[in-house]
């Protein structure tokens, strides 16, 4: 059974391996563990104030992640959205469930805008975000912050 729940520290190493495998091996993105020190400290980096980090598990297996970083002034950044290749697509609807979890939380916490940055080569992700109401925007329309990775070249906005 698939469950979406807030991140628990027992998943730290599995989460780091999961994300790096997708970034490096599946999409050949030039991102290393050292580029993402926040992954080793999810509770302090993502689970404070109005920010949060959720994981999707099938039994004990980590199959998806999504995070929200509070940027202040009602703005948030969608971060670390990853879904295991075997759980992608409409059959499972896992990406949509993860996004719905984040959006529901964002509305409860009175966010007005969500932003995200993504890599050019992640075409399926672009289609997913656009299908779910995100609009492509210029880099200068996105609030600055450490959530923007060097590989991010496409930026999106969603008004809540």
Show which residues each predicted segment covers:
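Extreme N-terminal starter segment of soluble prokaryotic enzymes
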Residues: 1-3
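Acetyl-CoA-dependent GNAT
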Residues: 6-87, 99-101, 105, 142, ...
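C-terminal "cap" of GNAT-fold acetyltransferases
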Residues: 7, 112-115, 119-123, 127-160
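Residue-level signature of transmembrane alpha-helix interfaces in integral membrane proteins
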Residues: 27, 107, 147-149
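Conserved glycine-rich acetyl-CoA-binding loop
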Residues: 61, 75, 84-100, 108-109, ...
């Amino acid at each position: 059974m698939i469950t979406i729940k807030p991140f628990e520290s027992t998943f730290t190493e599995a989460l780091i391996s999961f994300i790096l495998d997708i970034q490096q091996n599946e999409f050949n993105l030039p991102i290393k563990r050292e580029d993402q020190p926040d992954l080793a400290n999810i509770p302090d980096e993502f689970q404070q104030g109005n920010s949060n980090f959720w994981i999707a598990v099938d039994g004990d297996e980590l199959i998806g992640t999504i995070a929200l970083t509070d940027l202040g002034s009602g703005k948030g950044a969608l971060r670390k959205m990853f879904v295991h290749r075997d759980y992608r697509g409409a059959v499972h609807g896992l990406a949509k469930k993860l996004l719905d979890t984040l959006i529901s939380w964002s509305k409860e916490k009175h966010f007005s805008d969500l932003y995200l940055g993504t890599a050019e080569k992640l075409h399926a992700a672009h289609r997913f975000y656009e299908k779910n109401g995100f609009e492509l925007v210029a880099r200068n329309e996105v609030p600055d912050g450490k959530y923007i990775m060097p590989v991010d070249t496409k930026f999106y906005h969603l008004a809540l």
